[in-house]
């Protein structure tokens, strides 16, 4: 099965957030964009979709960012792929 670029980036965002789960500060879009070499504007759209879908909790402003809304082991990859 081939994944679209959108789905690939979506999974990368979720994996990055899962790997950073124990941090005090939330993950930022800039951090993920620099880590994977993806445009910030593209990631912003993906994060908005994940937030609307109940997978990410986002906080705006200084000290803001994103976190997983539920534990990583409860997120089904198939569910994410079908939704994107």
Task: Give the location of each predicted region.
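Beta-hairpin "wing" of winged helix-turn-helix
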Residues: 53-63, 67-69
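Conserved segment of winged-helix/HTH DNA-binding domains
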Residues: 72-84
């Amino acid at each position: 099965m081939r994944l679209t670029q959108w789905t690939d980036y979506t999974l990368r965002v979720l994996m990055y957030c899962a790997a950073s789960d124990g941090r005090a500060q939330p993950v930022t879009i800039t951090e993920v964009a620099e880590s994977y070499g993806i445009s910030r504007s593209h990631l912003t759209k993906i994060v908005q979709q994940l937030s609307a879908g109940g997978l990410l909790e986002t906080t705006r402003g200084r000290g803001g960012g994103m976190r997983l809304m539920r534990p990583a082991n409860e997120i089904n990859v198939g569910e994410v792929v079908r939704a994107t």
